[in-house]
């Protein structure tokens, strides 16, 4: 009888662990997280994400006058690679890949007009990506 209780307790603990993992995974999807380097990442279901820069980044940089994408859609990008160069009236900054990813889309509309990025950076994505693993955490 003690062995049966032991199995039941183990099964209950396993189920609780699985539920906790599922809740943590669900919390990551459809949620925006912020990096220490002033980028935001909005995770979506299916391993996708949008990446942009924060209001604070634009405040520090000043008016953004030019962006240059370093990769094309379909390219695989490794964590730490310079993905985008953002040039402002004060400086040029590189935005690095926060995790291994596949680039799905560059927001090429920004190449014609940077108004949205300067006025509402938290509503303006720079790239759409697909995460290559689930190891990204902040």
PLM segments and residue spans:
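Generic structural motif
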Residues: 38, 64-65, 96-105
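Generic beta-strand structural signal
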Residues: 93, 99, 125-127
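Acidic, low-complexity mobile loops and tails
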Residues: 11-85, 115-138
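PDZ-domain C-terminal substructure recognizer with occasional recognition of PDZ-binding tails
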Residues: 103-108, 112-116
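Short, Lys/Arg- and Gly-enriched loop/turn segments at beta-strand edges
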Residues: 85-97, 113-116
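Surface-exposed strand-loop junctions at beta-sheet edges and helix termini
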Residues: 71-72, 77-78, 89, 98, ...
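N-terminal chloroplast transit peptides
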Residues: 1-12
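Residue-level signature for short turns and capping positions that connect secondary-structure elements
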Residues: 56, 91, 108-109, 134
């Amino acid at each position: 009888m003690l062995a049966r209780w032991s199995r039941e307790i183990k099964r209950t603990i396993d189920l609780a662990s699985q539920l906790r993992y599922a809740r943590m995974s669900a919390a990551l999807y459809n949620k925006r997280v912020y990096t220490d380097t002033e980028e935001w990442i909005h995770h979506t279901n299916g391993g996708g994400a949008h990446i942009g820069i924060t209001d604070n980044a634009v405040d520090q940089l000043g008016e953004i006058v030019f962006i240059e994408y370093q990769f094309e859609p379909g390219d695989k990008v490794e964590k730490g690679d310079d993905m985008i160069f953002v040039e402002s009236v004060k400086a040029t900054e590189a935005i690095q890949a926060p995790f291994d990813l596949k680039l799905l889309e560059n927001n090429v509309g920004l190449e014609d007009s940077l108004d949205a990025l300067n006025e509402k950076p938290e509503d303006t994505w720079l790239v759409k990506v697909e995460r290559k693993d689930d190891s990204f955490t902040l």
